[in-house]
């Protein structure tokens, strides 16, 4: 009998006030204890209890102030990224109380040097026993650039060109220690074999790194590379490097097209498509009945202030939408931008979310509920499991990012009400079968790449 293909599950939430659901901090059941290490440890324990493959934390390097060029909305109303703790530090906190759960952190390949990034993730991978993933981003806008002493953010495709070289340099550093370089022969007084530790001497268009790294090779070979860029250039980057991809898609049809497109990019890059796992995000809202779950979803979305959504949308598109009255039709804003020849992603967002006929306020509220793309599913545990299985069998993804409606309770509900159904139906593990994140995802250990000594 053919063995049932297994679904992968990942948690995704900000180390701060909100993630996709911008009103989540106002939810009556939200603890808002996001400055406490115990808060993150509770979530990590919950996801490990549910046998999740991993969790990972996004990051942004600036408070959102594109909307109105001030902090009134982004901070005053609790916008996305108003509070954002450094993800790698939070991952270390969670690693200390878990044994199997994979742990991912986002660090920009644009604003940090490759030696620092390689060392951070190699350290986390050693301390966690090989459970770490790096979510590679190239950052978003000029606000982030200014926090690093740079006036203007690099152009989109140039950021990915630089990131290609950045990954090359980081991987060289991760490979600068052979598997058996650490000797620890007390009697002979030999700590390590210097012939098996290598300079990398990377000299490229963007970066220069000598090496070697000061951290021996990881228990899983290398940290898992995770990536979320879905632009054409981002997909090519994923095809070349990503071992897991985080996708945002509003419905099954778009999920299927995204899945097929990314797998094709992996194949075109000469890699095995089965060695890149694609996750798509969903936001389940659970209740003891469909009616109760729907009521809870409506309550969640009622907490979103339209200008909070517009603050994030302004940050994502680079357009100060506060320049327009809230009752302005989106189609009029798009026409104005086109007439002024202002390049923006707003056209793409509006088309993808069918928002052209909305007013600006309506668009803000919609964007603030789920950043426009994350499907919100209301139902019982059985119904949510049904939807996950339907999408999984329909070729939407290899697994799902579970975006929380509020924290920490959403994950407790999902683990208690949805995971057992998936397990009973044979779609999800009942126990971890390995120790590393690569074990969970079915990824091969990368072959050690030789370095010049």
Swiss-Prot record:
Chief subcellular location equals cytoplasm
Effect of inactivating the gene: DBTO2 but not 2-HBP is detected following growth on DBT.
Per the UniProt record, which EC number(s) apply here? 1.14.14.22
InterPro entries in the record: Diverse_substr_monoxygenases, Luciferase-like_dom, Luciferase-like_sf, NTA_MOA
Q: Where is the signal peptide?
A: none
Keyword annotations from UniProtKB, A to Z: Cytoplasm, Flavoprotein, FMN, Monooxygenase, Nucleotide-binding, Oxidoreductase, Plasmid
Q: Which GO terms describe its biological process?
A: dibenzothiophene catabolic process
Query: What is the top EC class of this enzyme, as a single word?
Result: oxidoreductase
Q: Name one Pfam family in it.
A: Bac_luciferase
Question: Which biotechnological applications are listed for this entry?
Answer: Can be used to remove sulfur from polycyclic aromatic sulfur compounds found in gasoline and diesel (biodesulfurization), which are a considerable source of pollution. In addition it may be possible to engineer the operon to make specialty chemicals.
Which reaction is the catalytic activity of this chain? Answer: dibenzothiophene 5,5-dioxide + FMNH2 + NADH + O2 = 2'-hydroxybiphenyl-2-sulfinate + FMN + NAD(+) + H2O + H(+)
The source's domain of life comes to Bacteria
Which factors induce or repress this protein, as stated in its UniProt record? Expressed during growth on DBT or DMSO as sole sulfur source (at protein level). Part of the probable dszA-dszB-dszC operon. Desulfurization is repressed by sulfate, cysteine and methionine.
Give the note. Reduced flavin is provided by flavin reductase DszD.
How it assembles, according to the record, is: Homodimer.
Similarity comment: family membership: Belongs to the NtaA/SnaA/DszA monooxygenase family.
In Swiss-Prot or TrEMBL terms, this protein is called: Dibenzothiophene-sulfone monooxygenase
Task: Name its species.
Answer: Rhodococcus qingshengii
């Amino acid at each position: 009998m053919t063995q049932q293909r297994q679904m992968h599950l990942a948690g995704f939430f900000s180390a701060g006030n909100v993630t996709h659901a911008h009103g989540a901090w106002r939810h009556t059941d939200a603890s808002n204890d996001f400055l406490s290490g115990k808060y993150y440890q509770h979530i990590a324990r919950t996801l490990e209890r549910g046998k999740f493959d991993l969790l990972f934390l996004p990051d942004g390097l600036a408070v959102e102030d594109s909307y109105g060029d001030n902090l009134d909305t982004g901070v005053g109303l609790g916008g996305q990224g108003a509070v954002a703790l450094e993800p790698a530090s939070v991952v270390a906190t969670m690693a200390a109380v878990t044994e199997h759960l994979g742990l991912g952190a986002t660090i920009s390949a644009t604003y940090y040097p490759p030696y620092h990034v390689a060392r951070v993730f190699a350290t986390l991978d050693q301390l966690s026993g090989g459970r770490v993933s790096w979510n590679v981003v190239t950052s978003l806008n000029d606000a982030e650039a200014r926090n690093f002493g740079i006036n203007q953010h690099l152009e989109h495709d140039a950021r990915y060109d630089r990131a290609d070289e950045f990954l090359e340099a980081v991987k060289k550093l991760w490979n600068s220690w052979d598997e058996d370089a650490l000797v620890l022969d007390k009697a002979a007084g030999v700590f390590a074999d210097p012939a098996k530790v290598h300079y990398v001497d990377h000299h490229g268009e963007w970066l220069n790194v000598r090496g070697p790294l000061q951290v021996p090779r990881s228990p899983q070979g290398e940290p898992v590379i995770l990536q979320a860029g879905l632009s054409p250039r981002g997909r090519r980057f994923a095809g070349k490097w990503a071992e897991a991809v985080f996708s945002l898609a509003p419905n099954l049809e778009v999920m299927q097209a995204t899945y097929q497109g990314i797998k094709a990019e992996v194949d075109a890059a000469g890699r095995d498509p089965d060695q890149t796992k694609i996750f798509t995000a969903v936001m389940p809202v659970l209740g003891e009945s469909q009616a109760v779950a729907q009521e809870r979803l409506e309550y969640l979305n009622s907490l979103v202030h339209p200008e909070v959504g517009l603050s994030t949308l302004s940050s994502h598109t680079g357009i100060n939408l506060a320049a327009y009255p809230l009752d302005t039709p989106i189609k009029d804003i798009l026409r104005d931008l086109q007439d002024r020849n202002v390049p923006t992603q707003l056209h793409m967002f509006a088309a993808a979310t069918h928002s052209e006929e909305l007013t600006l306020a309506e668009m803000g509220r919609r964007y603030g509920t789920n950043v426009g793309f994350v499907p919100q599913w209301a139902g019982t545990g059985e119904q949510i499991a049904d939807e996950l299985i339907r999408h999984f069998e329909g070729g939407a993804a290899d697994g799902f990012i579970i975006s929380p409606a509020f924290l920490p309770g959403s994950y407790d509900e999902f683990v208690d009400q949805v995971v057992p159904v998936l397990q009973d139906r044979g779609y999800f593990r009942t126990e971890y079968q390995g120790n590393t994140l690569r074990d969970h995802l079915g990824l091969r250990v990368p072959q050690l790449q030789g370095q010049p000594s």
